[in-house]
Amino acid sequence: MPEFLERLPHAVKQKVLQISNNDAKILGVFEQVFQCGQENQDARRKAVKTGVSERLEDSELIFELRDVSFLSPIRKKLNLAITIGSDGKPALLFNKDRVPEMAIPNLQESVKFAAFLPFPEKKNLLYLFIVYRTASDEAPDPVLLTMNKEGVLKQFKDKGLIPVDSSNFGECVDYMRKQAILTGFRIGDPFSNSQGPPAFHVECHRGTKEGTLYFLPDHIIFGFKKPILVFESNEIESITYSSITRLTFNVTLITKNQEKYEFSMIDQSEFANIDEYVKRNQVKDKSMSDELKAKPMVKAHQVGEQSALKEAQQQLRENRPTGGVPIDSDDEEADGNFESESELSDGSGSDSEADSDEDADDTDDSDGTNDTHDVLQHEEIQIAAADAEDEVLPDFDQAEAGIDIVIEEDDEEEGSGVEYD
């Protein structure tokens, strides 16, 4: 039996069981309704107690906007009012039919940030976003509400706050901003401000949640599905870009507390705006940090060395110079050393042995030529291996490389004429 049923009054519980007939899907719907009610109750408990009378009187009212859709901390239509509290200080009061449901008192000290934000893809709607703190310095869920521009224009005209023939919603925004200033706080309008740094927003995902990332002059906001994230620009220590594709990329914000927040599936067309924002706010871009670059650099170095070794081996196959050194000069020098070593090792110095060597060379000239060529190839391999600094090469088949590895045994028996004890 679902846990929420145990928290219902007995009579309500019996009715739910009777209607659902223990059907899991129907019980699931009832559970969602129950949880929704709990969230609203929790939000009301978190709401700041008002300093106004139980019912709002006209004498306490400074400004009121009716039938505004609230999305946070509660979801319902309420009236937004600026009033004078019992302590004589202005307060924001959210009420239904003049009955307060929540309020933010002492606006000058409570409101930390407020701004009008565009509603993506719906030009007829506008967000009002308010971040505030309580007297105990707690940070409740921010206030988020939407305004229908046409509905607000009509209310302002009916109250005579703007000319009847006006269709400029900006006049309504200006009026509300002035009222806020008079009562101790400011409402920013960053997307209409042509003097300061430009504000912009991008669509993205955080995990499975789709939302909007707002880049404001001094804040970054992700919303508006709970939890709503608000960052002050000076709280962000660094930023990284990752998962970059032809169409999208990811952004990770790292705070000074080393908390990481990744936002994915951002359109590539927004990269220039985000990068400019990062530079303007002097945020560190750690996308090319050493720890991220280390592996690609090592891999590229290894690939480069292997390519050089393969090229040297190809040159050996084609009997071409390796590393810019002529093969002929190396062969002559090597041959000279080889002959001198042969003479020193021969203790008799008799002409008969030299004659026998010449006879052997005359009778089998082709064998001697092949042996000398094998010696050259052997020494060239040693040079290439030394230049590569003991780099491990892929295995090559001797027959494929055209190299006889057992060179010295053939030289000792046929080419040198040297006898060993």
From Swiss-Prot:
GO terms for molecular function: double-stranded DNA binding; histone binding; identical protein binding; nucleosome binding. SUPFAM superfamilies: PH domain-like (SSF50729). Residues 328-344, 352-368 have a biased composition (Acidic residues). Residues 370-379 have a biased composition (Basic and acidic residues). GO terms for cellular component: chromosome; nucleus. The keyword Plastid does not apply. The keyword Nucleus applies. Keywords: Chaperone, Chromosome, DNA-binding, Nucleus, Transcription, Transcription regulation. It is found in: Nucleus; Chromosome. Residues 286-379 are annotated as: Disordered. Belongs to the RTT106 family. Interacts with histones H3 and H4. PANTHER family: FACT COMPLEX SUBUNIT SSRP1 (PTHR45849), HISTONE CHAPERONE RTT106 (PTHR45849:SF3). This is Histone chaperone RTT106. It comes from Eremothecium gossypii (strain ATCC 10895 / CBS 109.51 / FGSC 9923 / NRRL Y-1056) (Yeast). The lineage of its organism: Eukaryota, Fungi, Dikarya, Ascomycota, Saccharomycotina. The gene is RTT106.
